[in-house]
């Protein structure tokens, strides 16, 4: 058997098996030593590098995202700094009690009633959907009333064009502000009452610096609301951006604006902040050098080009501003309905005058009206006969 297996002696076989086992053991020891060397090298590399090699991609991403994060943080810091500047120009006082508010609110209702009866001057009352303004002492042109849009174009009305400040405003509001040293004696010569219905608003604006002194004082009544700074308005549909600062305004509270809050940033009332009827009395002082409309001595520079030169002579009182709306007496709910624009009135008038079969023709009703009107000018008989129909040829 020993010869068949290739070994001549059992001792040789045992000797050969022992050498193989020793080789295997030596290989295992060498592998363990090599693994230990690799681990030691990896530990040394980890100690030399702040991040492992496998984290290089993550580190690069973090480095790339740092500028974006810093820009956002910079924007937030700027916004917080601007809000701090706004707050530095705001002073709020809870001055009027519930009973005092009720008395003043009853007086405001009297103002609304007198306006509905047409007892005020033409420029005292300014109506808009969901918001009415009542000017006392001094009034001024703004918004769509201006011939030229933009800051600095506002003008005071001539003296006497708006009613005097009611005596109750002096007794119930102004006098208390003077007693608490909010404003000095004799400071106020302009009082405006803004009456808002739910959903009403006033767009972002700065009270004209060339018209009014600072501070600007307002007192709130009927309900709580908020005064927002730095908003941007968009219309159709109406949308308002996030404010730099939203200032809660409580019923009976006094808000005083000056400095940055009055001059360097816009303020507004958002529609979502008027949930109930709200009124605010704004008390201001006009500047001595504030520009004023002069209706008796108008210059051609303040009139539209269509005005003839002979209209500048005499004692005509043509206003130096384009008409904003009709000043005829309206029913109590008229101010809270959508305005009917002049173009809508014209379209309605056409629909009444045009024949029924012409209202929905294959050509524009506007062209039909224009051609019909031109034909009536050429034919006096057609102009004098309202029932005469003008047949137009289609082209």
Swiss-Prot record:
Keywords: Acetylation, Coiled coil, Differentiation, Dioxygenase, Disulfide bond, Iron, Isopeptide bond, Metal-binding, Methylation, Nucleus, Oxidoreductase, Phosphoprotein, Spermatogenesis, Ubl conjugation. There is a cross-link at residue 329 (Glycyl lysine isopeptide (Lys-Gly) (interchain with G-Cter in SUMO2)). Binds 1 Fe(2+) ion per subunit. It catalyses: an N(6)-methyladenosine in mRNA + 2-oxoglutarate + O2 = an adenosine in mRNA + formaldehyde + succinate + CO2. Belongs to the alkB family. It comes from the Eukaryota. The modification N6-acetyllysine is found at residues 133, 236. Residues 1-28, 47-83, 294-395 are annotated as: Disordered. 2-oxoglutarate binds at residues 194, 196, 205, 267, 278. This is RNA demethylase ALKBH5. It holds the Pfam family 2OG-FeII_Oxy_2. The modification Phosphoserine is found at residues 65, 70, 88, 326, 362, 372, 375, 385. The gene is Alkbh5. It is an enzyme of class 1 (oxidoreductase). Residues 296-306 have a biased composition (Low complexity). The C-terminal disordered region undergoes liquid-liquid phase separation (LLPS) for the formation of paraspeckle membraneless compartment.
């Amino acid at each position: 058997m020993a010869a068949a297996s290739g070994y001549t002696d059992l001792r040789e076989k045992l000797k050969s098996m022992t050498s193989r086992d020793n080789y295997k053991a030596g290989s295992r020891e060498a592998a363990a030593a090599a693994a230990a060397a690799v681990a030691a090298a990896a530990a040394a590399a980890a100690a030399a590098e702040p991040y492992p090699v496998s984290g290089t991609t993550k580190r690069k991403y973090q480095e790339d995202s740092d500028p974006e994060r810093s820009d956002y943080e910079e924007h937030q810091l700027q916004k917080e700094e601007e809000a701090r500047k706004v707050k530095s120009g705001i002073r709020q006082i809870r001055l009027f009690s519930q009973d005092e508010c009720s008395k003043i609110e009853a007086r405001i209702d009297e103002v609304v009633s007198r306006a509905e009866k047409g007892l005020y001057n033409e420029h005292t009352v300014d109506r808009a959907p969901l918001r009415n303004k009542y000017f006392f002492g001094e009034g001024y042109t703004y918004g769509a009333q201006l011939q030229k849009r933009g800051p600095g174009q506002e003008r005071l009305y001539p003296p006497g064009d708006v009613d005097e400040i009611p005596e109750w405003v002096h007794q119930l509001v102004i006098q208390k502000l003077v007693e608490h040293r909010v404003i000095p004696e004799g400071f106020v010569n302009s009082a405006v009452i803004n009456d808002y219905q739910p959903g009403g608003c006033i767009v972002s604006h700065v009270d004209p610096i060339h018209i009014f002194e600072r501070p600007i004082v307002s007192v709130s009544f009927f309900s709580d609301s908020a005064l927002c700074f730095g908003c941007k308005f968009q219309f159709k549909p109406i949308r308002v951006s996030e404010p730099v600062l939203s200032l809660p305004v409580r019923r009976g509270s006094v808000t005083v604006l000056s400095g940055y809050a009055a001059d360097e940033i816009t303020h507004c009332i958002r529609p979502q902040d008027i949930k109930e009827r709200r009124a605010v009395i704004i008390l201001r002082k006009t500047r001595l050098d504030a520009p004023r409309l002069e209706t008796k001595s108008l210059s051609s520079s303040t009139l539209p080009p269509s005005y003839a030169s002979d209209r500048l002579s005499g004692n005509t009182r043509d206003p130096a501003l384009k008409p904003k709306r009709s000043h005829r007496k309206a029913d109590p709910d008229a101010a809270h309905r959508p305005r009917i624009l002049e173009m809508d009135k014209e379209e309605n008038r056409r629909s009444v005058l045009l024949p029924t079969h012409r209202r929905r023709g294959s050509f524009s009703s506007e062209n039909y009206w224009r051609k019909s009107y031109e034909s009536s000018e050429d034919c006096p008989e057609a102009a004098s006969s309202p029932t005469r129909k003008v047949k137009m040829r289609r082209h």
